Amino acid sequence: CDSRQFFKEMTIGTAVPESKELAAAIHYFIQNRSVFDSYNVGEFERDALEKLEVLFKENPIQIMVGGSGLYVDAVLNGLDYFPEVDPKIREALLLKIEKEGIEVLQKQLKELDLETYKLIAIDNPHRIMRALEVCIGSGIPYSTFKNKPKKQRNFNNIKIGLNADREIIYNRINQRVDAMIDNGLIEEAKTLYAHKELNALQTVGYRELFSFFDGNFTKEFAISEIKKNSRRFAKRQLTWFKRDKNTLWFDYLTDKLTIASEVSEKINKLKE
């Protein structure tokens, strides 16, 4: 459940599972789309629920893995209702970001809706503009619309999270970025550079390299920015997932059998 691993042109930058990992278990929604396709969280919710309906007939236990919190929430709890917004608001925000930069919009969102500011990927201009246009158009914080009753699904879920000390997470991120560069991320980004305005490419790892290609960053600075923004994104991911008090958290070094045992216990309780 990774909102960027859908796209087949973004293999290296999204750390798509290796072929042996994909062969170990059947995967869905991995590189099944093109960056040129229009695909949003609502469409994913629909497609995932349709796929689950089929898969549950084969096995009552299915596993969803990934770090895109909004997409996970869409499948488990349904999407929130948001009011229609005057397109002129989006046009004004686009003009502002072009003239003054994303930092101005980040500051505005922080003032209008601190809760959303703390949770979303604030380096993603589309996410920032979406939250702001709702705040401005409705006169109500974007987060208010997200605090509605959850939709009822015809399945139960058990949520599991793996965590580690911040220093370990950040070191892993730095190593992962270095590995991506060694594996050809710069070359992959070059093949997508002509289409850098696409929503799918407003992504850490590509956005910084596009600035390098534009001549705004040196190669070394672009790589350091990828690391910094990846660390920032990881911090926000943890903030997002830790909102849910029902998640079972384990240290990343916890023995697999221990995790399996606790999960099995939870499953058995659901059967009672």
Question: Which role fits each region the language model picked out?
Answer:
Residues 1-272:
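Phosphate/pyrophosphate-binding catalytic cores of soluble transferases and nucleic-acid-acting enzymes
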